[in-house]
Amino acid sequence: MNIQLICETENPEKFTALCTQYGLVHDPESYLALVQTYDEQGQVRLELRKLDEAKLGAVFVDFVAGAMAHRRKFGGGRGEAVAKAVGIKSGYLPTVIDATAGLGRDAFVLASIGCRVRLVERHPVVRLLLQDGLQRAYADSEIGEMLQQNMQLLPVSHIAQLNPALDCVDVVYLDPMYPHKPKSALVKKEMRVFQHLVGADLDADNLLEPALALANKRVVVKRPDYAPFLAQQSPHFSRETKNHRFDIYLTG
């Protein structure tokens, strides 16, 4: 993939090696840039910037502070919609594969509750952002040990590469990117950056079959309320929220 590669830190060697490993090629004409920089505490982090719309800000993964820390401490916990959708109950914490991990937010909610979550991410830039955020979180004194136990990024880029006989879990969770309505305003500025990078998930339908093969209990698909069923396959039932629904396919 071609993207601007910018290093603002003193030691670019690791950044260069990571980019090479993930097939990223520096393109000085690209408006999207993967940047290795310093955060407010002086720690090295990776972030994504849209250079022609700097006001949108950078996209990065931070499980320790900011919105994710607030959600962990003051969010709904087991009452969150994603927790109900995967079937969390008193005394039952399913094992989960998040096959479209993205920035890891839903997976982090489940991991914070106590689920063991394995992550798969197909886009190389998003995978690097997620890997970087996890590594920084693993080193945190408050949540590092919990996340090392409960959130693991798998060394595959698609769940079709997993073996149902060896890698099965209770729940497979899917949240593929879906185009916004043409006239709708994007709620979050960072989503404009993220969607410009990833675009619509045109092969999302190909996720359902391997997901069903890996899930012992259910497959959960998060969709906008206006989106059709994944792979045109009707779920056993759905859970609806204000703007989304969770389509649930039972497997056992």
Curated annotation (Swiss-Prot):
Transmembrane segments: none annotated. Its EC number is 2.1.1.242. Pfam families: SAM_MT. It comes from Pasteurella multocida (strain Pm70). PANTHER family: RIBOSOMAL RNA SMALL SUBUNIT METHYLTRANSFERASE J. One of its GO terms (cellular component) is cytoplasm. It catalyses: guanosine(1516) in 16S rRNA + S-adenosyl-L-methionine = N(2)-methylguanosine(1516) in 16S rRNA + S-adenosyl-L-homocysteine + H(+). Keywords: Cytoplasm, Methyltransferase, rRNA processing, S-adenosyl-L-methionine, Transferase. It is found in: Cytoplasm. One of its GO terms (molecular function) is rRNA (guanine-N2-)-methyltransferase activity. InterPro entries: 16SrRNA_methylTrfase_J (IPR007536), SAM-dependent_MTases_sf (IPR029063). S-adenosyl-L-methionine binds at R105, D106, E121, R122, D175. This is Ribosomal RNA small subunit methyltransferase J. It is an enzyme of class 2 (transferase). Specifically methylates the guanosine in position 1516 of 16S rRNA. Belongs to the methyltransferase superfamily. RsmJ family.
